[in-house]
C-alpha cells in the first residue's frame, strides 16, 4: 500500500513539474531616442517585428518624430481586450488612408488597425499571405496558397 501511495505521489509530482510556465506579458515601454522634429508633415512610423515562428510573437512598435520617443509593443497596450500579440510571423505592413494593414503570414491574417490610435478595427483571413499593395482603392495581397479571392 505504501509503494502504491509513493508511486501515485511520484506521478503527481512529475505532472506538476511538467506544467508550462505562464507566458510573460511584455508591457510597452517608451524611450526617447532623438530630439523632437519640428515642422514635419510625417508624424512617425510603425515597425512590424516578425517574431519567432510558432511563438505568436509578432509585435508592433511606433516611433513618434514629434516627440522623439520610440514605443515598443504598442499594439498589445492599445488592444488589451484581444490576444496579447499580433500573431505568428509578421511579414508586411502598409498604411492606406487612415488605416494600417499588417500581414501576419503563419496566422493567415491581415490585421487592420487605426493609424492614429493603433486600435484594432478588424482581421481579414487570407491563407498564407505574404505581401500587400494598394492601387486605386483596391488591396492586392500575395499568397503562397494559390488563387485568392476576397469578396467583402
Where are these regions (language model features)?
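Bacterial Sec-dependent N-terminal signal peptides
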Residues: 3-6, 13-43
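A short beta-strand motif characteristic of beta-propeller blades
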Residues: 23-25, 69-85, 116-124
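Signature of short aromatic-glycine-proline-rich micro-motifs recurring in repeat-based ectodomains
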Residues: 30-31, 86-92
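Short coil/turn segments that connect the beta-strands within blades of beta-propeller domains
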Residues: 41-45, 97-98, 136-137
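Conserved beta-strand positions in repeat-built beta-propeller and related beta-rich domains
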Residues: 47-55, 100-106, 141-145
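Structural motif
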Residues: 54-61, 109-112, 148-151
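Short loop/turn segments that connect beta-strands within beta-propeller blades
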Residues: 65-66, 114-118, 151-152
Amino acid at each position: 500500500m505504501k509503494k502504491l501511495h509513493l508511486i501515485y505521489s511520484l506521478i503527481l509530482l512529475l505532472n506538476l513539474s511538467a506544467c508550462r510556465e505562464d507566458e510573460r506579458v511584455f508591457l510597452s515601454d517608451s524611450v526617447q531616442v532623438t530630439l523632437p522634429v519640428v515642422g514635419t508633415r510625417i508624424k512617425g512610423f510603425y515597425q512590424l517585428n516578425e517574431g519567432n515562428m510558432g511563438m505568436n510573437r509578432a509585435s508592433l512598435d511606433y516611433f513618434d518624430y514629434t516627440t522623439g520617443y520610440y514605443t515598443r509593443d504598442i499594439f498589445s497596450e492599445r488592444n488589451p481586450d484581444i490576444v496579447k500579440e499580433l500573431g505568428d510571423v509578421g511579414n508586411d505592413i502598409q498604411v492606406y488612408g487612415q488605416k494600417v494593414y499588417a500581414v501576419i503570414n503563419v496566422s493567415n491574417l491581415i490585421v487592420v488597425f487605426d493609424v492614429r490610435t493603433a486600435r484594432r478595427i478588424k482581421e481579414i483571413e487570407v491563407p498564407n499571405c505574404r505581401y500587400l499593395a494598394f492601387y486605386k482603392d483596391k488591396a492586392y495581397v500575395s499568397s503562397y496558397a494559390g488563387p485568392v479571392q476576397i469578396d467583402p
